[in-house]
């Protein structure tokens, strides 16, 4: 009898150990999320809205649900659209302003206007992925998207700004297996009077009975499209595409990386594209007003953000660090200093909220360095000396040791790094920002 109990006891111990390990892992992941509320891991932060053999639509979880510290982003959502070659995203409208960036492939965007007009735009990644007017979709505008390329997939990142509430609603005219047409929700007599037709005809032409749709309608909101239709759409799109807006872009770059920015004043949004070579460092900097949402398109990077510790009012600073990879998202609050080091060739798409009258302030580097500007303001080498432990002359000498700007060589000596880390540990717990 005793022998029979031993295996059962061992099984019980193993079960409890497994349960404990699982709980510990879950708790650790939750703590990591709480410790860094600005980091959205691609593995568990994207929710799929629709998926079939031709592509998918997915949305990043709401920013304010990740952390109360991101509640100023509650009216913004990030959406990703991917589609296979020669496909069509069926006509729809959304209760949100949309900004589109093509991150791979090419697209034909068609906007349907109420005065019997259509606007066609041909968008490619090669068009420096910065928004212009033709990549902005006003709320409530019916639009559809085509991937005209016979070989390459299409990937679009869009920033959505709801006009009703934090939830976004996409209204599709089509009736498919994935969803029904919103027109079907109107009563029979409303439809008959509106179309001046019998309901049976309306149902047959617009909706079809379940199981009677044509094959193309059963595939969902992303469907295949034949080459003849693509060719016709391409003619209109190419003739209607606007000229390049490159002169309006603010581009900064060197051998280590490039930054291109543009502000859409009508939407108060900054749009940026960042490309960095492996080993490059985007020196510490901050944005004066804009809250920047970074999306990793390709590659990997290490990011360090400095901000107040925890959710409570505190005078202590904390470093929020993350290892970023493809499809990860990182939020940079206004006035929070940040540095990015490329651990491989990497590129980002960035959206800056509250961008009007925003300034980017660098804390290191040869040009646009606000610390060195303190010395020029008020004839202020003495001010620098009062600000830091060294004299103003020593501070300027230290700053001038870095001959690069914005993007610099991120490699450094390990011994120096270890020494600096020890000194940083000694300084932890000291007061940082005033909170009021």
From Swiss-Prot:
Transmembrane regions: none
Xref: Gene3D superfamilies: Jelly Rolls (2.60.120.10)
Low complexity bias locations: 417-426
Region Disordered, residue ranges: 233-257, 411-436
Main location: other
PTM characteristics: N-glycosylated; glycans consist in Man9(GlcNAc)2 and Man7(GlcNAc)2 when dually glycosylated at Asn-258 and Asn-347, whereas it consists in Xyl-Man3(GlcNAc)2 when solely glycosylated at Asn-258.
Keyword Mitochondrion among UniProt keywords: no
Role played: Major seed storage protein.
Family: Belongs to the 7S seed storage protein family.
Quaternary structure (record): Homotrimer.
The name this protein goes by in its record: Phaseolin, alpha-type
Organism ancestry: Eukaryota, Viridiplantae, Streptophyta, Embryophyta, Tracheophyta
């Amino acid at each position: 009898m005793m022998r029979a109990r031993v295996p059962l006891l061992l099984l019980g111990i193993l079960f409890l150990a497994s349960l404990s390990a699982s709980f510990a892992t879950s708790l650790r992941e939750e703590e990591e999320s709480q410790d860094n509320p600005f980091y959205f891991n691609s593995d568990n932060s994207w929710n799929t809205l629709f998926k079939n053999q031709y592509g998918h639509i997915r949305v990043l979880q709401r920013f304010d649900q990740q952390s109360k510290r991101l509640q100023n982003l509650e009216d913004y959502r990030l959406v990703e659209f991917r589609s296979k070659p020669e496909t069509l995203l069926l006509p729809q409208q959304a209760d949100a302003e949309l900004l589109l960036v093509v991150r791979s492939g090419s697209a034909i965007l068609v906007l349907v206007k109420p005065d019997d007009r259509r606007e066609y735009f041909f968008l490619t990644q090669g068009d420096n992925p910065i928004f212009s007017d033709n990549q902005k979709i006003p709320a409530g505008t019916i639009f559809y998207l085509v991937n005209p390329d016979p070989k390459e997939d299409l990937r679009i990142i869009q920033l959505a700004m709801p006009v009703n509430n934090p939830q976004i609603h996409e209204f599709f005219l089509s009736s498919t297996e994935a969803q029904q047409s919103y027109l079907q929700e109107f009563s029979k007599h409303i439809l008959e009077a509106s179309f001046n037709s019998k309901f049976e005809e309306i149902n047959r032409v617009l909706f079809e009975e379940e199981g009677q749709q044509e094959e193309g309608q059963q595939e969902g909101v992303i469907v295949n499209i034949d080459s003849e239709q693509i060719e016709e759409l391409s003619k209109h799109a190419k003739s209607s595409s606007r000229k390049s807006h490159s002169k309006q872009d603010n581009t900064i770059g060197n051998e280590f990386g490039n930054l291109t920015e543009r502000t859409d004043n009508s939407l108060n949004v900054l749009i940026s594209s960042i490309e960095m070579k492996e080993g490059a460092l985007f020196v510490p900097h901050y944005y004066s007003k804009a809250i920047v949402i970074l999306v990793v398109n390709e590659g990997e990077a290490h990011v360090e953000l400095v901000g107040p510790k925890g959710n409570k009012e505190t005078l202590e600073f904390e470093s929020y660090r993350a290892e970023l990879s493809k499809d990860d998202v990182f939020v940079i609050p206004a006035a929070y200093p940040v540095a990015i080091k490329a651990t491989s060739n990497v590129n980002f798409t960035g959206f800056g909220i509250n961008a009007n009258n925003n300034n980017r302030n660098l804390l290191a580097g040869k040009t646009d360095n606000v610390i060195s500007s303190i010395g020029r303001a008020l004839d202020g080498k003495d001010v620098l000396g009062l600000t830091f432990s060294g004299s103003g002359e020593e501070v300027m000498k230290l700053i001038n040791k870095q001959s690069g700007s914005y993007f610099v060589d991120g490699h450094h000596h390990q011994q120096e790094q270890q020494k600096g880390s020890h000194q940083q540990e000694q300084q932890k717990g000291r007061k940082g920002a005033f909170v009021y």
